[in-house]
């Protein structure tokens, strides 16, 4: 998945307010990547996808984690406010073709 595809994907999954937040997070992630010598595209991709599961319900997030327990890393035992990142990383790997472990870790 490239940055354009990620941007289109999250646009379709998020409310206007959350989408604007996500674009601002991407800008900050790129600034931080530049400052610390990290790959800017990877930082931007992770930032774009992190909140991609933020607006789905708890039951759907639970189902995603249960369908992929090997990727959920005990997600259900974690506080529910962090479930969206775990689920976003699972979806990125299983449905959206993201394979880079650093990106997936940053999404989660």
For each feature predicted by the language model, list its residue ranges:
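A generic alpha-helix surface/boundary motif
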Residues: 4, 26-27, 85-87
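N-terminal glycine-rich anion-binding loops that anchor highly charged ligand groups
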Residues: 21-22
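Generic N-terminal amphipathic, Lys/Arg-enriched alpha-helix
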Residues: 1-15
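Divalent metal-dependent catalytic cores for phosphoryl transfer on phosphate-bearing substrates
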Residues: 8-12, 35-108
């Amino acid at each position: 998945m490239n940055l354009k595809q990620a941007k289109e994907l999250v646009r379709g999954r998020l409310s206007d307010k959350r989408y604007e937040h996500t674009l601002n997070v991407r800008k900050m992630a790129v600034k931080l990547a530049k400052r610390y010598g990290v790959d800017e595209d990877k930082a931007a991709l992770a930032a774009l996808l992190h909140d991609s599961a933020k607006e789905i319900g708890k039951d759907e997030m639970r189902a995603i984690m249960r369908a992929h327990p090997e990727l959920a890393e005990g997600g259900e035992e974690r506080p529910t406010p962090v479930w969206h990142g775990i689920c976003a990383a699972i979806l990125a790997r299983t449905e959206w073709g993201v394979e880079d472990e650093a990106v997936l870790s940053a999404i989660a």
